[in-house]
């Protein structure tokens, strides 16, 4: 199961989150949870090709999505253990700047919701963090400083914390 949601019988409608998925065949399963309720339902699905939405699984260095400078990418941190990696490179010494935006997480404005890290690949299977910051639910837009870095391969890592409950994020590098 890639995503699960529950809708209560008294809810007139329930919207799911957007999911970034690789091309392929997917199935939607609708199941009742209560033997006493035999209600009808209507389901509306929207499928749209999008090259700037994160593609799961991008939870490791090896499966990181490629990010092109100046392009805004969107994604979703679904759980506290969800991690999204984006890979980019500097062909010469330069700088990396990442801007991340998200809607206010109501009731969690001062709570750390996400961790944003910029990581340098030093050698095969050897990585080092060059910048890390925590993002609160009320921080709707944050930017890293211009990080002066040597040429090489870099990763932008966005991770949930124990307070994360599925939030849309957008970032530009």
Task: List PLM regions with ranges.
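Short amphipathic, basic-aromatic surface patches that mediate peripheral association
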Residues: 96-107
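Residue-level detector of conserved, well-ordered beta-strand and adjacent loop positions
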Residues: 6, 55, 78, 89, ...
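Short coil/turn motifs at helix boundaries and re-entrant loops, enriched in small/polar
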Residues: 70
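Surface-exposed beta-strand/loop patches in noncatalytic accessory domains
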Residues: 1-13, 33-35, 45, 76, ...
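Short tyrosine-centred short linear motifs in exposed loops/low-complexity segments
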Residues: 39, 92-96
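Surface-exposed ligand/attachment interfaces on beta-rich extracellular proteins
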Residues: 81
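C-terminal edge strands of extracellular/lumenal beta-sandwich accessory domains
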Residues: 17, 22-67, 84-87, 108-110, ...
């Amino acid at each position: 199961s890639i995503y699960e949601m529950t809708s209560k019988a008294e809810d007139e409608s329930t919207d799911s989150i957007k999911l970034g998925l690789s091309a392929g065949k997917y199935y939607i399963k609708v199941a009742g949870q209560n033997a006493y309720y035999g209600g009808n339902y209507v389901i509306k699905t929207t499928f749209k090709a999008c090259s700037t939405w994160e593609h799961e699984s991008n939870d490791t260095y090896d499966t990181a999505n490629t990010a092109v400078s100046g392009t805004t990418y969107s994604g979703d941190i679904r759980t506290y253990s969800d991690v999204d990696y984006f890979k980019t490179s500097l062909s010469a010494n330069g700088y990396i700047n990442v801007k991340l935006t998200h809607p206010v997480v109501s009731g969690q404005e001062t709570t750390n919701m996400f961790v944003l890290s910029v990581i340098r690949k030093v050698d095969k299977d050897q990585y080092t963090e060059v910048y890390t910051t925590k993002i609160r639910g009320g921080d709707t837009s944050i930017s890293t400083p211009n990080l002066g870095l040597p040429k090489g391969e870099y990763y932008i890592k966005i991770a949930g914390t124990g307070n994360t409950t599925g939030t849309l994020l957008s970032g530009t590098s």
